A protein has these predicted regions:
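Hydrophobic core segments within long, regular secondary-structure runs in both alpha-
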Residues: 44, 55, 100, 116-130, ...
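Aromatic- and glycine-enriched glycan-recognition loops and surfaces
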Residues: 109-121, 155-158
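Single conserved hydrophobic/aromatic residue that forms the stacking wall/gate
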Residues: 211-220
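Sec-dependent N-terminal signal peptides
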Residues: 4-12
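A conserved hydrophobic secondary-structure block that centers on an alpha-helix together
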Residues: 143-209
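Conserved beta-strand->loop/alpha-helix structural units within folded catalytic cores of enzymes
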Residues: 93-105, 160-163, 176
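C-terminal motif of bacterial Sec signal peptides marking the signal peptidase cleavage site
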Residues: 15-16
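Low-complexity, Ser/Thr/Pro/Gly-enriched N-terminal "stalk/linker" regions
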Residues: 21-95, 119-139
Length: 220
């Protein structure tokens, strides 16, 4: 009896799970859209203390490392002047961009005029370091622009990707688009270098090109 009931139940479930190709075609596609983080406020008991620690400890340490303990921000200053040596490793620009992205996320839930002022100061340095053709990378600006885009392992696209992530995040957090415009010029420069009949590389941070499409969509 138990075996019969089990068999009958299985048959009933299988029958309910059957879907014809016609049924599948008639079902509307449901698009999943990412929610802009600037529309999200976090105030729960688990994450709020961690976000507070991010503001009070993580960001100050990151800023100190970038401005005082290493030459990362100085690389942008030197690149803007077109003189001086590059300090650190070739992908160090990305660490500055990551820290700025962290500032942007923090400003949503913890507005801080001083933190925003520091972010704006960094962005001014980025913009000053950008080349007339849109290229921005302090390593090659200071070691030889003739060598740019010759070695995929040197993280040029990777650094550009993190800059774009930071630029989009800061625009969403503050409405300020100075860094976003720097990112657009760099993206346009990369489009002039890569594609059919041009260079063929695997991008180092392809998701950033998707993220920049949202705030720039009305422009194209």
């Amino acid at each position: 009896m138990k075996q019969y009931l089990l068999l009958a139940a299985s048959a009933f479930l299988l029958q309910g799970c059957q879907t014809s190709k016609e049924d599948i075609k008639e079902q509307p596609l449901k698009m999943i859209e990412q929610i802009d983080f600037s529309h999200v406020k976090i105030n729960d008991n688990f994450w709020s203390p961690r976000l507070s620690k991010h503001v009070s400890a993580t960001l100050p340490v990151c800023s100190d490392q970038i401005e005082n303990q290493t030459g990362r921000i100085r690389n942008f200053e030197n690149a803007a002047k077109g003189e001086g040596e590059h300090s650190g490793i070739f992908f160090d620009d990305s660490d500055v961009y990551k820290a700025l992205e962290g500032m942007a996320y923090s400003l949503i839930n913890n507005p801080d005029p001083e933190l925003e002022k520091k972010a704006d100061e960094w962005i001014d340095k980025f913009a000053a370091a950008q080349q007339p053709d849109g290229y921005i990378n302090t390593f090659y600006t200071l070691t030889g622009l003739d060598k740019r885009w010759t070695n995929m392992d040197k993280h040029e696209m990777y650094c550009a990707g993190h800059m774009i992530e930071a630029g989009v995040a800061y625009y969403q957090a503050t409405g300020k688009r100075k860094l976003l415009d720097v990112c657009i010029r760099m993206a346009d420069h990369m489009m002039s270098q890569f594609g059919p009949g041009k260079r063929h590389w695997v991008p180092g941070h392809e998701l950033s090109l998707i993220h920049i499409s949202e705030p720039t969509r009305p422009l194209y």
